[in-house]
Amino acid sequence: MDAVIAPRHEDCRDAERRAEPLPANAPLSMPVQSLLQSPQAAAVRSPAAWRRALIMVATAVLSAAGIYEMYQVLQVGGITVLEGVVLVLFAALFAWVALSFVSALAGFTVLCCGWRDDVGIMPDGSMPAVSSKIAMLLPTYNEDAPVVFARLQATRQSVDETGRGAQFDWFVLSDSTDPSVWIDEERCYAELAATHDRLYYRHRPYNTARKSGNIADWVERFGGAYDFMVILDADSVMTGDVLVRIAAAMETNSDVGLIQTLPVVVQARTLFARVQQFAGSIYGPMIAAGTAWWHGSESNYWGHNAIIRVSAFAGSAGLPTLAGRKPFGGEILSHDFVEAALMRRGGWRIHLAPTLRGSYEECPPSLLDFAARDRRWCQGNLQHGKLLTARGLHWVSRLHFLTGIGAYLTAPMWLAFLVAGILISLQAQFVRPEYFPKDFSLFPIWPAQDPVRAAWVFAGTMGLLILPKLLALLLVLIRSQTRRRFGGGLRTFGGVLLETMISALTAPVMMVFQSTAVIEILLGRDAGWQVQHRGDGAIPLREVVRRYALPTALGATMAVGAWLVSWPLLLWMTPVIVGLLLAIPVALLTTRVSRSRPLLMTTPEQIDPPAILAQVHALADRLRPANQTTDPLSALCSDRRLRELHLAALAFHPPRRRGRIDPHLATARVLIDDAESYSEAAGWLGPREIRAVLGDRETLQRLLKLSGEHAQLAVGSEPSG
């Protein structure tokens, strides 16, 4: 189906006749939930109890075996203090690896035996009927507007092709603070609304509570009119097939509050993004199937590409503000985990649908961009430590919090483990051992380890890390259709080797970045809310050197320290040291954009691109004018329909509260009143003043009056809502 947008010459009044900027209010109460009291909720019976017992027992047995072997390595001459530290760190890290391995093994098994969805979704069955009213919500914050709207429109066209489009309404919920982005969003909305009804746009003047507050604001204003809502990210694309199927599953299962799909990374252009794309495509389904199998009705929510029962969300997921100062207090950052836990506490089932195809997202183009996003997630996940003791949570929900915290604490733990290992070697090499301590002892203390057993422990640990990759590869190779979708068995095998090599090089650097993030958070540094970079990944050389100086210096220090101790220690630490020493060249290599189709690490979406992704590109090109101005005020002055739409949309902004003064708006009013011309006033206004002017109808009209030819039109424009 061709991408369709409004003709550029069509007046905005025609668009307003087809679709109001916002629908009529349908308020729905969303009370803040208490963490100190457990609500009364119906019990949820899950068939996953025996599955969880199996997973936990297998993890415990595997962990005990690994820890015992490590103890045997260290106890040859008695456990010293440093060896005790190493043993404790190893126990925690090995248990983490063991749980991941057992869960992946479960995923391999259930996919081999044939996955059966707990909510009855049939990926290849006939298209089900849907009678419920569904809202598609796209929260956005300072993103590239033409691309964001193109993704939404491509998703909409795919839904319309199923014949179920009448059940869906479409909302763009903007929290953008950049004036140019704000006006560009309105321009794109006007283009699409001219030919498509049930498309709505709302801009919040104050982005209270960030994304979670954006969704909560919509629920409280419009949620009463809808049965379900689908949350998208700015980089999300979903096919109509998957949307209709998860909506039908929600109708069939009245006690299900949320179904999370498995988003597949697409549109990767840099080598780093391609590694993430390939890894997610080949390993992701098996890992997700394993977690879905034993999480059951206590699965998790990842914040996007998921369908939610609006009444359940409103009644159970109102987020409280955490006591204390940032970064651990204040607004809950990683809200998705918490919302899922609260909904499950409220008696609603939370499910993951790992086998549905047609749910897509994109990946940061570079390791630095990935680390910047990871920094926010790290703070949000560590914040969950305050929620572990919340009353009434299911133990699996608490486990989600623990695993989220552990995902970041394991980085400094691995680093501490490496440092402790070096110190033990230094102690053995340079410190004269005290064979006979001051206290009475019948036997001397020999600082010694068992090198042969240590090698076996290392090999076993590496096996647990690598074997899931091989199992996922095996799943592809034994299925002829899947093998062809990845480009053939040989290319897939080569892709796994290349992905493993690049991941091994970047993992030590990510360990340093995550360790730094944890330390910063513990020192009280807040991550803020930065714009997600989704470009081509190009980073200036000076910035690369500056940002990767710490990992490189750490690698050099480790290399020198290990070399001074012994060659065997240096060889033992080579995988980590090489990754750190090559941090800068690997960073430059992995941010390069490849224009040609790659030979290795290809995914099904690259071999046979879905039509919906091609539509995104076509729509984005049509929504982006060739001579677009970046000045939002000039855009309003030169475009009558855009000006009318903006003034109409301001009618939906909440009125200013008496006694609350916006200093930027007050400054703008003084500057505008003092100016003798539009160009003079516009030149005096800074970005914050421009944003304040754009959000105040009266002040904006005073500025437009100065533009002469637009004066009467600007003043005479009335909101159509």
UniProtKB/Swiss-Prot annotation:
Entry keywords, A to Z: Cell inner membrane, Cell membrane, Glycosyltransferase, Membrane, Transferase, Transmembrane, Transmembrane helix
Molecular functions (GO terms): hexosyltransferase activity
InterPro entries on file: Glucans_biosynth_gluTrFase_H (IPR023725), Glyco_trans_2-like (IPR001173), Glycosyltr_2/OpgH_subfam (IPR050321), Nucleotide-diphossugar_trans (IPR029044)
GO cellular component, one term: plasma membrane
Disulfide bridges in this chain: none
Membrane topology note: Multi-pass membrane protein
Protein name: Glucans biosynthesis glucosyltransferase H
Organism encoding this protein: Rhodopseudomonas palustris (strain TIE-1)
